[in-house]
Amino acid sequence: MPKMKTHRGAAKRFKKTKTGLLKRMKAYKSHILTKKSSKRKRNLRKATVVSKGDFKRIKQLLP
């Protein structure tokens, strides 16, 4: 069986943590920022963990 290829789009968006979880950045931070509050934009800068429901599918993209 040939080697599995990593999904390059997923590789750029997700990073594995030491404990095996997947880290991702939040959306809604690229444009139309004037109407968003400073607090909201500040919270969007923080990374978060991929939800349990999406974890299984994303894990298949990153062998």
Swiss-Prot record:
Domain of life assignment: Bacteria
GO BP annotations, alphabetical order: translation
SUPFAM superfamilies referenced in this protein's UniProt entry, alphabetically: L35p-like (SSF143034)
A Pfam family: Ribosomal_L35p
One Gene Ontology term, aspect cellular component: cytosolic large ribosomal subunit
Keyword presence, Ribosomal protein: yes
GO MF annotation, one: structural constituent of ribosome
Protein's UniProt keywords contain Ribonucleoprotein: yes
Keyword terms, alphabetized: Ribonucleoprotein, Ribosomal protein
HAMAP family recorded: Ribosomal_bL35
Similarity comment text for this entry: Belongs to the bacterial ribosomal protein bL35 family.
Name assigned to this protein: Large ribosomal subunit protein bL35
Organism expressing this protein natively: Alkaliphilus metalliredigens (strain QYMF)
